[in-house]
From Swiss-Prot:
Consequence when changing G484E: In ku113; restores vulva development in a let-60 n1046gf mutant background
GO molecular function list: ATP binding; mitogen-activated protein kinase kinase binding; protein kinase activity; protein serine kinase activity; protein serine/threonine kinase activity; protein tyrosine kinase activity; zinc ion binding
Residue sites binding ATP per the record: I483, G484, R485, G486, R487, F488, G489, K490, V491, K503
Catalytic activity: L-seryl-[protein] + ATP = O-phospho-L-seryl-[protein] + ADP + H(+); L-threonyl-[protein] + ATP = O-phospho-L-threonyl-[protein] + ADP + H(+)
Native species: Caenorhabditis elegans
Signal peptide: none
Name of protein: Kinase suppressor of Ras A
Outcome when changing G494E: In ku83; abnormal sex myoblast (SM) migration. Restores vulva development in a let-60 n1046gf mutant background
Segments of skewed composition (Polar residues): 152-169
Domain of life the protein comes from: Eukaryota
Protein kinase domain location: 477-748
UniProt cross-references to Gene3D superfamilies, sorted A to Z: 3.30.60.20, Phosphorylase Kinase, domain 1 (3.30.200.20), Transferase(Phosphotransferase) domain 1 (1.10.510.10)
ZnF locations on chain (Phorbol-ester/DAG-type): 215-269
Amino acid sequence: MMQTQVASRAGYSNLPQFGAGIAQDIKTQAINNLKECLKLTTINRFLTSSYEEDAKSVERKIFSAVYQMTKIGLIDREKREINAIWFTFVGLSAQNIRHLEICSITDFNALFSITNQELRSLADRGRLDVETKRKLLQSTVILQNHWNAYHSRTSSGSTDEPSGQSTPAIVTPSPKFNVPSLSVTSAKMIQSSSMGFATTPKSPKTSSRLVHAIPHKWHRSTKFRFSGDAVCHFCQRPLGFGFLNAWEKCRSCKWKVHTQCKGRVGDSCGLTPDHLRFLFDKLIQENNGGMWKDPQSVPGSRSMNEPAFQFPDTAIDSSSSTNSSAPSTPALPAGISGNVSSLTAPYRSERKFLFPDTENYSVHNRLPILVISEGDHPTTTEIQQETENHNKSAAASMSGNIESEGTIVANHEDSTGSQEVDSEAAPSQEAVDKFNKRADGGFTWERHAWNMSTIRGPNAQASWNEVTIQFETIEFDKQAPIIGRGRFGKVLRGFHYGDVAVKVYTMEHISDASKKAEEFKLEVSAYKNTRHDNIALFLGYFMSDGQYGMVMSLSKGSQSLYTLLHVVREKLDLATTRKIAQQICQAVSYLHTKKILHKDLRSKNILLESKNKVVITDFGILSMKRLAHPKQKSGYLTSKFWTNYIAPELAMAMRTEYDEYECDDFPFSENSDVYAFGCVWFEMLTGALPYAGELPHQILFAKTQGIRPVLPNVKCTQELKELLVSCWNTAPQDRPTLTDINLKLTALPKKPRVNRSPSFPVMMKSYESTF
C-alpha cells in the first residue's frame, strides 16, 4: 500500500510509447515490489493494541489499490480513493478523511509535501482526538521512512540526489529505458532526502539491517553570542559567548557542538531524544516487564552475550530475524513482522464471552461463580479474636491475602477458611539470593523480563539490602495490631523508627516454594521504584520464615473513599470531587510513566488523609493466579463489588475454571485503569456504585455484551458526562489517558469567590450550582 504513489510519481502515463511488452514487464516487476512492501502494513501494530474485525476487507482494498497503481494514467478520483483506503487502514474516520481532502491532502504527494507541524495543525483544526492524531502523524513518518529505505535499495550504485529534491516514491527501474519521475520540493522532503541508509548486503548469509546514518550539515557561525547559556549537545559543556569560542551548528537538526566535538558526533542527524524515548517505551512494552505481565509469561532472553534490546537501526542477525530475505526484499526495522496474514487477528474487545470447551470442563454454558465476602469491615469480635491470636504467637498469622482496604477490607472466607503458611515451605537462602547472586566473577543474568526492577551490576545486592527489613526488628502494637484484613492478606500496626503499616501477604498461589521469594521480589519492585506525594510511601520489605510483607508509611486519621461515600454517606461538592479526581489521575499516571499498572483501582484502595490529600495503595498486586487461590468450584473468591470496577476486556478473560499452565493472566493495561477511574468518578458524582443492585454474574455478562452502567439523573454539566462516558468506551484504545483527563478537569472553571453584602444578594448562577 505504501507504494500507491508509484504510478502517479513515476510517470507511468508515458509507458505506452515503449510498447505493450515492455510495459507489461515493468508492470509485473512493479507488482512484485509492491507486494513486498505490503508487509509494511504491519505498521498498524505501532498504532493500535489489536486489529479490527474488518482487517481482511481492508487488506483486500489495499491489494486492489496495488493493482490500480499499476494502471496507466490514474485520474484524481482514483488517487482520492487510494488515499482514503490508506487513511481508513490507519484508523481515520470518513469525517477525518473528508477534512484532509478539503485541506488539499488528496494523495501521498500532498501528504509528504507538508511538515509534521503543518500536519499536526491540520489535525487540530479537524478536531481529531489525541489518539487519532497520534496515529496519523506516526503512520506518516514511518510510511515515508520506509519509502526512503526502499528507494536506497533500488537506487544503489547511483549518485546522491542534489539537496532540495525529494526522494521519489518507489520506482521500478528497467535495464532498457529510464522511467521519468516527478519530484516535490518541501522542507519535509528535503530532510527525508538527506537520510542515508546502509546498503543491504547482497549475500543472504550476511546480516540485513537498516542503519541510522544521516550526516549532519555543519556550518560555523560567525555571529557574536551574547548569551553563554547554550551547551554542547555532545559533551554538555557550555558553548560560551563571543567570537573566541569555536562551535558549529547543524542546518537540519539544529544541534550545536564544539568544533573539537564535531568529529565524535557521528552520522546521527535527526536522532532526537523524542525518537529515543519512543524506542525506549516500545522496548518496555514489547519486553513486558514484571509489572505488565505475569513473569512466567515473559519469554527469556536468547543469550546473555546478546544485547537486551535491539534498536531498529542496529544490526540483527539474519538467522534470527524474520526480516532477512533475498536481496530484492527491503530491510524492515526490528519489531515489524513480515507476515501479512497476521493482520487478520480479530479485535479482542468486540468478541463475545467465550465459554470453555465442553470436553475440557465439567461446567458448561455459564459464567464463572464469584464467591463474595459477607462484609467489608471486620467486626469488633473478629478484631479482638485476631488480637488475641497475635499476642499468643511470635508473628502475625499469614491467613488471607491483602486486598486493600488499606483500604482495608475484612474478607470473610467461610468455606475456605484461613490457612497458615507452613514454615517448612519457606524458600532457602539460595532461592532468596538467586536474583542477584554472582559466580566466577561474573553475573547470573535472570532474564525473565526486562524491567525497572531487574537491577544488574555489582551493586544489585546492596540496592536490595537498603530496603530489606528484619521482621524481628518490627514492634507490633500489642493491644490492637490488626488494622484490617483483605482478600490477599492482613495489615498490622507496627513501629519501625516510627509508626508504620505492615502488609503481610500470602504466597500460597505459587505452587513451587523455590519461586516464592523471586515472585515476591517482582511484586515489591513496583513499590520500590515509586516516589509520589499521592502514593503510599514504601519503606522496605521482609522475607523471613515463610513470611512475606512490606512496610509502608502509616496514614493516620485516614479513611477510604469507599467509607466516606457509602458508610458515612457524605456528599462531595464539585470542588472537592475535582480535587480528589485530579490527585488520583496524577498518582496513577505517574505509575503509568513508570510502566506500572494499578490493576485494582477502586474506592477501597484510595485513602483520604484529608479532603485535600489522596493516597493510592495496593497497586500491581492483583493477578488471576492470586484470584484463583484458594481454588473454588467453577469460580473465584473475590471481594465485594470487585466486578463493578473491572473493564470489559478483563471480564471476557475470565473462565469458569483456572488452569495455571493454560490460562493467561488478565490483559491489564493503562486503559483498564482508565475504566476503573471512570467507575470511581461515577461514585463521587452520584454517591452510588455502577451496576448498583446487580449480581456479580449479571455484571460480568453485561460487560461482555458492551452494556454500560445506567446513568441516573445526575445534575452535572455536559463536559462531566462526556468525560465519564469516554472512560467507559468498550474499545480500550478509544478511552482517554489519565493525563488527558487531568487536563480536562483542570480546564473546568472554578467557582469564583464573590464578596458581596448579605443585603444585596447577587442573582447569578454559578458553575457549581448546576451540579
